[in-house]
């Protein structure tokens, strides 16, 4: 090689790699930004209702908060996890250009979730008796039970909504979901004002507003799917095929539900445990602040995890294992950057954050001391969300469920209880247990991802969605 002559092949390969990385970053951000908005907007519906109830007095506020938490643990979380199976099935089918299968999978998921909603609604109908059974105050249990009953229609709508969301997300069609969520949130504010403050329904009106809003969102998105040209190949109408292969769907859906529930239940469990600590009012108040802060920030991570799932499932379904691998590296990098920003912001506002929730100086000071632990947990939670998204994109729900079981219930929760009660660290000890669980979860999922044979995963995706000769609804 002569002096002064640059090897053109090396430059071309390097430039090509950088171009691919930049393109992948653009795709990830284009997907994740609307998904973050969707997560925040849909999460805000229940928060807005509780805020309106707060103007009615301390008893309705306490009851609505407990009913909302109970509804999340016994209903919404389970349906959310079950619907997440579509991230694997629809995402890989779309990548394989088997567009007709997306509509079939969505109908199948809707059928399963509607069936599951029936026993869950029976649980909600008996909320008062269940709360009394676990020694909640009877007056609070009575109001919470009534609140939960008015939320029962929202349970069925929520399951359908999650199915439609994932059907559209799998097609990279995320902006309509964001727009419909925004319209629904605006309507919800109006409904809460009308039902809670103007019609005399009181706290019941707040619960009813949730039900109406979720159904309104379902109708909006259903109309979009029905009439939009972008869904003309993936939605071809109702089909009897949806009632077939239910067992195959459940093999992914059940572990997917377990994967989500095990994680979210552990947070609620430790907040409940804080009520058994010395000075339970202080501990419970501060842990609730930490939980609400973490849940709000978690919505950002959920959006990133959704983008990871879409990109990985699409590329594996399309038979592009190396592009899927690149997508993983890019989204992890984005999650690290997001985590650094979150930690920086939380630490900078740690002394004033408590004022948003309370005027009690003890609660404010205690919350400030907890923020560094919470910030560490949020950083790790961002990583686990994108790694869990990768797991859903690959169809690793069983692995994810096992990892979450071990991380939270064999390590995190026992350690948190040990630190909180035996070593008398209190709420800090409980939250340190969560941080430890997240650390183990991130480590395990990272190892699984690092040692993945992506060529093999692409073949699995091809087998899962079916032969390319069966491209019903394919568009060339």
Swiss-Prot record:
UniProtKB keywords: Membrane, Transmembrane, Transmembrane helix, Transport
Pfam family, one: MatE
TM regions (residue ranges): 29-51, 70-90, 111-131, 140-160, 177-197, 205-225, 252-272, 286-306, 326-346, 363-383, 405-425, 431-451
InterPro entries: MATE_euk, MATE_fam
Chief localization: membrane
Location of the protein in the cell: Membrane
Annotated signal peptide: none
Record's bilayer topology term: Multi-pass membrane protein
Gene Ontology terms: biological process: xenobiotic detoxification by transmembrane export across the plasma membrane
GO cellular component: membrane
Gene Ontology MF: a single term: antiporter activity
Family: Belongs to the multi antimicrobial extrusion (MATE) (TC 2.A.66.1) family.
Designated name of the protein: Protein DETOXIFICATION 17
Species of origin: Arabidopsis thaliana
């Amino acid at each position: 090689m002569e002096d002064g002559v640059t090897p053109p092949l090396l430059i071309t390969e390097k430039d090509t790699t950088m171009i691919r990385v930049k393109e992948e970053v653009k795709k990830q951000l284009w997907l994740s930004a609307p998904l973050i908005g969707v997560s925040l907007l849909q999460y805000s519906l229940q928060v807005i209702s509780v805020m309106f109830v707060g103007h009615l007095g301390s008893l309705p506020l306490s009851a609505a908060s407990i009913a909302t938490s109970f509804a999340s643990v016994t209903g919404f979380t389970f349906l959310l996890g079950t619907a997440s199976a579509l991230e694997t099935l629809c995402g890989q089918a779309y990548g394989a250009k088997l567009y007709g299968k997306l509509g079939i999978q969505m109908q199948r998921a809707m059928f399963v979730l509607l069936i599951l909603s029936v026993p869950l609604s029976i649980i909600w109908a008996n909320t008062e008796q269940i709360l009394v059974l676990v020694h909640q105050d009877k007056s609070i249990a009575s109001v919470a039970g009534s609140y939960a009953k008015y939320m029962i229609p929202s349970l069925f709508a929520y399951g359908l909504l999650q199915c439609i969301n994932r059907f559209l997300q799998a097609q990279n069609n995320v902006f309509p979901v964001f727009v419909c969520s925004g319209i629904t949130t605006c309507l919800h504010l109006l409904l809460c004002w009308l039902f809670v403050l103007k019609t005399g329904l009181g706290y019941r009106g707040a619960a009813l507003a949730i039900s109406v809003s979720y159904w309104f969102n379902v109708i909006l998105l259903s109309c979009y799917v029905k009439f939009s040209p972008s869904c003309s190949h993936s939605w071809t109408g109702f089909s009897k095929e949806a009632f077939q292969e239910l067992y195959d769907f459940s093999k992914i859906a059940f572990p997917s539900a377990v994967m989500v529930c095990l994680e979210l239940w552990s947070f609620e469990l430790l907040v409940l445990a804080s009520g058994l600590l010395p000075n339970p009012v202080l501990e419970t108040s501060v842990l609730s602040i930490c939980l609400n802060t973490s849940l709000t920030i978690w919505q950002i991570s959920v959006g990133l995890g959704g983008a990871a799932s879409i990109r990985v499932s699409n590329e594996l379904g399309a038979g592009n294992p190396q592009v899927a691998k690149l997508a993983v590296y890019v989204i992890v990098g984005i999650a690290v950057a997001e985590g650094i920003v979150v930690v920086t912001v939380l630490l900078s506002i740690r002394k004033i954050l408590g004022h948003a929730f309370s005027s009690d100086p003890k609660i404010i000071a205690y919350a400030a001391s907890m923020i560094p632990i919470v910030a560490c947990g949020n950083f790790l939670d961002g990583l686990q969300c994108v790694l869990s998204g990768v797991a859903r994109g690959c169809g690793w729900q069983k692995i994810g469920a096992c990892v979450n079981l071990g991380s939270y219930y064999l390590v995190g929760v026992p350690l948190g209880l040990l630190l909180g009660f035996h070593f008398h660290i209190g709420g800090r000890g409980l939250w340190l247990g969560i941080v430890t669980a997240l650390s183990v979860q991130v480590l395990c999922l990272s190892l699984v991802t690092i040692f993945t044979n992506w060529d093999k995963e692409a073949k699995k995706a091809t087998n899962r969605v079916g032969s390319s000769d069966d491209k019903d609804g394919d568009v060339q």
